[in-house]
């Protein structure tokens, strides 16, 4: 019975194709390729790769982009950037990369010093997986398909958890935290969070709608705000919305370096080690089967070493990934309420109970080491008595 149905269906489909062919339609034998040069609308210009390789005279891009193109080539992304698609790119030119190599958090002095993980972070963090004009960055589409303008301040990048796997050695593990003790001898492979990293942007419309003034911007980014400007993290867009066959190219005045989530920044900062020690009390490694599988599938395809187990560096909290509490330890033991932070400082995509992923961010006011030491070691401050009562060693 089923074979007869299949045969009848096959004859019906052949009949439909024949009818369409007679009528002048050729859908069943369509060889139309959007990537063929003759099929591309002239107003779309070049592909993103071609535009960066040889900027059009009509475009506002300036300088050369050999280093950025090298990232594309090394990561096997040339075909994607050369074909039709939907990407938004925020690229820095070679002069900006020269400045980056003079001073960066990885101490990379040249392109050759970049590891594959660093290359992935620099490249994938500078890309959005859809085509968005800069004036549309702060717009958010609601469930009823209407658009609310001027509220978004971040977008999900092309980066994945497997792009940022770190092997953490004993000297870098949280101190006085038994959850990490099994990994002191050989270290541990971790991702800081397995949700997609976000790109933070500041547009004039979003700043006006949310009461962010120039002084606020300077405090957040460390540079003055230029009226009408659009910034990606702290990098100003100096050439915008260059239309290409597969999306838009924007040029930034500096290399976009992912700052990491709040927990990472506190951990990596040179003058917040005491606050980081306090924060470390609330973290633990959680085995991540999906990230381990994803990484090893890719490693197998590309002939690279596989990793036995990859963990997430997570924080006990009332609000964590997926807006769900993380209130059990890695062994699924329930945690006391006083072991839960208000929210997870390592959650890349944090949003509050009344916000959205695109329009909301967390904030932490973190004292530097000097302030912490003064609070606990100065007899005139309240922390001095606390330390006297609970410190294991005398003051």
What do the predicted segments below correspond to?
Residues 2-16:
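Bacterial N-terminal signal peptides that target proteins for export
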Residues 28-395:
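Mature, structured domains of secreted/extracytosolic soluble proteins
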């Amino acid at each position: 019975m089923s074979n007869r149905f299949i045969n009848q269906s096959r004859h019906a489909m052949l009949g439909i194709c024949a009818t369409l062919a007679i009528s002048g339609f050729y859908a069943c034998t369509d060889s139309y390729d959007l990537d063929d040069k003759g099929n591309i609308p002239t107003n779309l210009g070049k592909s993103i790769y071609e535009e960066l390789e040889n900027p059009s005279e009509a475009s506002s891009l300036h300088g050369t982009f050999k280093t950025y193109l090298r990232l594309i080539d090394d990561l096997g992304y040339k075909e994607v950037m050369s074909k039709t698609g939907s990407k938004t790119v925020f690229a820095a030119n070679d002069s900006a990369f020269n400045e980056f190599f003079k001073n960066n958090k990885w101490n990379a002095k040249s392109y050759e010093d970049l590891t594959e993980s660093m290359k992935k972070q620099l490249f994938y963090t500078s890309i959005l997986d859809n085509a968005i004009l800069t004036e549309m960055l702060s717009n958010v589409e609601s469930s009823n398909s209407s658009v609310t303008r001027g509220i978004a301040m971040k977008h999900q990048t092309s980066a994945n958890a497997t792009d940022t796997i770190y092997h953490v050695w004993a000297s870098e593990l949280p101190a006085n935290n038994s959850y990490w003790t099994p990994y002191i001898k050989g270290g541990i492979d971790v991702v800081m969070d397995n949700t997609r990293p976000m790109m933070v942007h500041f547009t004039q419309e979003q700043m006006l709608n949310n009461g962010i003034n120039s002084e606020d911007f300077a405090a957040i980014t460390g540079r003055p705000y230029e009226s009408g400007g659009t910034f990606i993290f702290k990098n100003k867009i100096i050439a915008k919305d260059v239309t290409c066959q597969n999306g838009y190219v924007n040029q930034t005045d500096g290399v976009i370096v992912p700052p990491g989530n709040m927990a990472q920044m506190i951990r990596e900062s040179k003058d917040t080690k005491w606050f980081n020690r306090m924060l470390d009390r609330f973290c633990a490694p959680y085995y991540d089967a999906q990230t381990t599988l994803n990484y090893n599938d890719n490693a197998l395809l590309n002939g690279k070493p596989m990793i036995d187990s990859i963990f997430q560096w997570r924080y006990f909290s009332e609000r964590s990934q997926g807006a769900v509490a993380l209130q059990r330890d890695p062994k699924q033991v329930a945690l006391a309420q006083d072991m839960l932070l208000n929210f997870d400082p390592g959650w890349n995509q944090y949003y509050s109970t009344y916000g959205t992923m695109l329009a909301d961010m967390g904030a932490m006011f973190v004292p530097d080491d000097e302030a912490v030491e003064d609070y606990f070691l100065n007899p005139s401050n309240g922390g001095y008595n606390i330390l006297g009562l609970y410190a294991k060693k005398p003051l």
